[in-house]
Amino acid sequence: MSKEKIAVAYSGGLDTSVMIKWLKDKYEGAEIVAVTGNLGQKMEVDNLEQKAIATGAKSFHFVDLRKTFVEEYIWKALKAGALYEDVYPLATALGRPLLAKALVDVALAEGCTMLTHGCTGKGNDQVRFEVAFAALAPHMKVVAPLREWEFTSREQEIAYAMEHNIPVSATKKNPYSIDENIWGISIECGVLEDPMVAPPADAYQITTAPELAPDEPTVVDIEFAQGVPVALDGQQMEGLDLIVRLNELGAMNGVGRLDMIENRVVGIKSREIYEAPAATILHFAHRELERLTLEKSVFQYKRNIGQDYANLIYNGTWFSPMRKALDAFVDETQKPVTGMVRIKLYKGSMTLLGRTSPNSLYNEALATYTEADTFDHKSAEGFIKIYGLGLKTFHEVNKSE
């Protein structure tokens, strides 16, 4: 029997570190190809490679995905207004299909026979990875160690890692599970599993506690071109740099902390803590610019599309014809979404200070209540009669109702 060559989505965290050793034991003689994608998370690449090799990987591949992530994933979600259940900007969920694609690309190039990930059997990510694998490499075998192995808790994994000298940062005193990329950080496990327990200070990774944030506010001007952020405070910037800077400014001012109970793909509710300063600010600014530039029916209908798009991302069906169809609709709506939004960041809050656009549909002469008013008030009477005619007729016929 030929030996397996297994491509592992490797993060260097507890699960994937333990997983390499476990796979080596289960598939005797297997060659492990560790693949790490850079989505903007903090990491020490040299140490990561050393850790992977020391843990048992035959080779290590590091793929810089940041530019692709911003331009082909994040901006699409932002333009769509994709916030899962009106809160979560989908940082982890957005990164999974791109990481899956990177893993498949390396696996095919290296002649691997199997794909594997470090996702739990009751989480969302197993669905996201495996649905992506099915779309991109349907012929390849997939193994999910966390659904098979003997460990039933993170504490047991930590003990296993210590027994086998596997270097991991998680400890029994620091049990948080953390996933990070440039669009946000997710934190779960430990005391956070009790929805009545306020997140301890050490759970937050980048944001300042609002009460400890600067006493002076930070004002930012964000410019968009057809729905895409292109400049910050008058300076043209690449998307990656703009997000990095907004993360810094937002985090400094305590902006971007999210605490939600969300509905997972597998049917359970989970408590999630997120830090997403740039994502929170940009979604807020983008929506306000849309209010100014989109025709009423488009603006209102697009809110439904945003929810559909968020569900699609969250549920792991990024590589679907539906996403492409929604992209076409969204791109059409974004043609007039050009302009600037001014926001004040202060002690955990965002306050809209102003917005402007060459495509603004706001007509001050029609909206004003001063003598400059050009609205034809006499037209209102006839409009109201026609507008309410259906209801009037209904209630004349159905007097008891």
UniProtKB/Swiss-Prot annotation:
According to its UniProt record, in which pathway does this protein act?
Amino-acid biosynthesis; L-arginine biosynthesis; L-arginine from L-ornithine and carbamoyl phosphate: step 2/3
Q: Per UniProt, where does L-aspartate bind?
A: T120, N124, D125
Per the record, a Pfam family? Arginosuc_syn_C
MF terms in GO = argininosuccinate synthase activity; ATP binding
Keyword flag Transferase: no
The record's subcellular location field reads: Cytoplasm
* Listed PROSITE patterns: ARGININOSUCCIN_SYN_1, ARGININOSUCCIN_SYN_2
- Keyword ATP-binding listed? The answer is yes
The primary location reported for this protein is: cytoplasm
Known catalytic reactions: L-citrulline + L-aspartate + ATP = 2-(N(omega)-L-arginino)succinate + AMP + diphosphate + H(+)
This enzyme's EC code(s): 6.3.4.5
Q: Which GO terms describe its biological process?
A: argininosuccinate metabolic process; L-arginine biosynthetic process; urea cycle
Give the binding site residues for ATP.
A9, Y10, S11, G12, G13, L14, D15, T16, S17, G118
Q: Which domain of life is it from?
A: Bacteria
Quaternary arrangement and interactors, per the entry? Homotetramer.
Entry similarity comment? Belongs to the argininosuccinate synthase family. Type 1 subfamily.
HAMAP family recorded for this chain? Answer: Arg_succ_synth_type1
What is this protein's name? Argininosuccinate synthase
* Organism this protein belongs to: Chlorobaculum tepidum (strain ATCC 49652 / DSM 12025 / NBRC 103806 / TLS)
Encoding gene (name): argG
